[in-house]
Design a protein with these regions (language model features):
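Conserved beta-strand in the GNAT
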Residues: 65, 71-80
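Conserved GNAT-fold acetyl-CoA-binding loop/helix
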Residues: 27-52
């Protein structure tokens, strides 16, 4: 990937592109994120899905891993999006997780900054994310510069309701 890796403090934490061998830790971090947000009922990720969709022939997402002392301590997953209203490409951060022992050490900031760097290199005009209402990281997102868009609500059609819709 053509972006410089972040080094938070020399020898402390670096950000790198995720690799297939990170699939297990990615699933663990995603599960911990779901637990942190009290949304485990929605969590169904598997290593197989991560490998297929993050590293397969038709990649659906990309990921960055934060590493400290040789150990993964953070994860950012993101994918491309398009705004027809703006007529421009953007990136959306799907997941941002920092292990408890690494919180407060700017790991999340550097993960977001490197996703922003990738977005800029690719000509994206915006970076967005969706946040669970109860997520205490909302304050962090505001400090980084994300704006809460009061006029937008997210609606989701679950798979069972989607297939039921097809029968109408």
């Amino acid at each position: 990937m053509g972006f410089p890796l972040s080094a938070i403090e020399p020898g402390d934490v670096t950000i790198r592109q995720a690799m297939p061998e990170d699939a297990a830790i990615m699933v663990r971090f995603l599960r911990e994120l779901a637990e942190y947000q009290a949304t485990t009922e929605y969590f169904h990720a598997t290593e197989e899905a991560i490998l297929r969709d993050g590293f397969g022939e038709n990649r659906e997402f990309e990921a960055l891993i934060a590493v400290s002392e040789g150990k993964p301590v953070g994860l950012a997953t993101f994918n491309r999006t398009y705004s027809t209203w703006e007529g421009s490409v953007g990136l959306v951060i799907q997941d941002l997780f920092v292990a408890e022992e690494a919180r407060g050490k700017q790991v999340g900031f550097h993960l977001v900054r490197d996703v922003a760097r990738i977005a800029e290199e690719r000509g994206a005009t915006h970076l967005q994310l969706n946040v669970v209402h109860a997520n205490p990281a909302r304050n962090f997102y505001a400090r980084v510069g994300f704006n809460h868009m009061d006029d937008l609500l997210t609606y989701r059609l679950s798979h069972d309701k989607m297939t039921a819709l097809l029968d109408l």
